[in-house]
UniProtKB/Swiss-Prot annotation:
Protein's GO biological process: defense response to bacterium
Protein origin, superkingdom: Eukaryota
Keywords per UniProt: Amphibian defense peptide, Antibiotic, Antimicrobial, Secreted
Tissue distribution: Is synthesized in the stomach and stored in a novel granular multinucleated cell in the gastric mucosa. It is stored as active, processed peptides in large granules within the granular gland secretions of the skin.
Chief place where the protein resides: secreted
Protein name: Antimicrobial peptide PGQ
Compartments reported by the entry: Secreted
Gene Ontology CC terms: extracellular region
Amino acid sequence: GVLSNVIGYLKKLGTGALNAVLKQ
């Protein structure tokens, strides 16, 4: 449902931010 989509989106954002930090 919508909640699953939101959670998936937040996880994607969190992973992207984490990867950006680790690459620095």
